[in-house]
Amino acid sequence: MSRMKRDGHRGRNFKIRAVFVGVLIVALLAAGYVLGRKWELSQYQEQRGQMSSGFGQIPTIEVEGVTYEQKMNLTTVLLIGTDRRSDEVSEGYRDGGQADFLLLTVVDHDAKTIRQLQIDRDTIAPVSVLGLFGNKAGSRDMQICLAHGYGVDKQERCKNTLASVQALLGGQSIELYVEIPLDGIGALNDLLGGVTVTLLDDFTASDPTMTAGKTLTLTDQQAEILVRSRMSMAVGTNEARMSRQRIFMDAAVPMIRERISENSGFASEMLDSLSPYLTTNMVRGRMINELNKAYHYD
């Protein structure tokens, strides 16, 4: 392999690692919903696969005649970005807003690797729906972003979204979730003193200063415009919006890493600023351990 290819490979691995570290840093700040790690290595779905007879056997799945064993020592995190603000009140059991951003991160502790899958909000998947009085009303195939609309509270909406992603992926288990509302993006941007990006699209329908090709340090409102805008854009596809969301993340994560390296108290400052916005089932101590391990992975 040439040096250029090796350097490119290292660059991609660093970028993936940086994004995951950023996700874990943000997730760490919630520290409010204690679930523990009782599922790890023990709870697996059986759809589209089978469990060999006998206690402790590894689940397998067959694809095109090839049998694969399920990896056991994994940490899986679903990052959910919603189209609601944290102070918006949901009315009823079917008004929880939509999941505009879905990013699944898989950490393989044996292989010491980190892999990501960003899921288009318009993907059709099984969604568990509720009736007017909160009763379970079966499952329907619809846009996966709509799964977040169903639930009695934020935790239940996250779980419903996670269940739809699991179903989309053939019943594979996802252990952890982090939900970030729309104004959480602005809060993160403010904490970092403004994230600097180069705009690849024209946003002047929402902000006359956000012209294509301009390098701009975002205000909180501009950060929300960048990650949310779609219908007002020349290219109004969700694929284009997904690219813009990654532009913001790719710019924000190195800033987070730099702040932490410069100031050991920055994590506490982040906790104070972001914890009111986040919903998660992650435990603070667990996140510290995951962060320390994943920092050295490819």
For the regions a protein language model found, what residue spans apply to each?
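Non-catalytic, solvent-exposed segments at the cell envelope interface
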Residues: S2-I25, L29-D298
